[in-house]
Amino acid sequence: MIMLKTQRRIAAELLKCGENRIWIDPERIEDVAAAITREDIKRLIHDGVIKKKPIKGQSRARARAFQEARKKGRHRGPGSKKGKKTARMGKKEVWMMTIRALRKELRKLKAEGKLDAHTYRRLYIRAKGGQFKNKRQLYMFMQEHGILKE
C-alpha cells in the first residue's frame, strides 16, 4: 500500500476540510503518489482525482418515527415523564387557566341575572383568594349557601 499521508494533508489544507474527508481515486493512486507539490495536488483536484467527501449528517429518520409515534399517543405514559408536574405546565399557567374559567363563569351568571353585583363581587374575591379549585366547587359553594337564584 502506497503511503499518501502528505498528499492527503496537503489536499485537506487546499480543500479546507479534515484529512478523513479526502477521497482519492483508487485507480489513480500512482499519480497521487507522484504528486509532491501543492501545484500537483491542485491539478489532481481539478482533474477530479482528489475530491472532498460530503459531511455525514445526523439522520432524523428515527427522530421522525418517534415523533409520529408520539402523535399517536405512544411514549407518553407516566414512565416516560421526566421532571416535576410543574415542568410540563407551570403553576402560574395552571392558575391562569383556572381563574379565567371561574371569572368567565361568574360573568356569565351575572349577565344571566342569577347573581347580583354584591354577590358577584364577593364570589369574585373568594375565587381570587383560591377558595375554588374549579367550577364544580364554585357551584357547590353557591348551592350550600343558597346563593344561586333559579
Curated annotation (Swiss-Prot):
Q: What SMART domains would the database entry show?
A: Ribosomal_L19e (SM01416)
**Is this entry keyworded Ubl conjugation?**
no
Q: Which GO terms describe its molecular function?
A: large ribosomal subunit rRNA binding; RNA binding; structural constituent of ribosome
Which residue stretches belong to region Disordered?
A: 56-89
Q: Where does this protein come from, organism-wise? A: Thermococcus kodakarensis (strain ATCC BAA-918 / JCM 12380 / KOD1)
Chain intervals with Basic residues compositional bias: 71-89
Q: Does the keyword RNA-binding apply?
A: yes
The coding gene here is: rpl19e
Q: Name one GO biological process term.
A: translation
Xref: HAMAP family:
Ribosomal_eL19
Report the Pfam families cross-referenced here: Ribosomal_L19e, Ribosomal_L19e_C
GO CC term (a single one) = cytosolic large ribosomal subunit
What name appears for this protein in its UniProt entry? Large ribosomal subunit protein eL19
- Quaternary context: Part of the 50S ribosomal subunit.
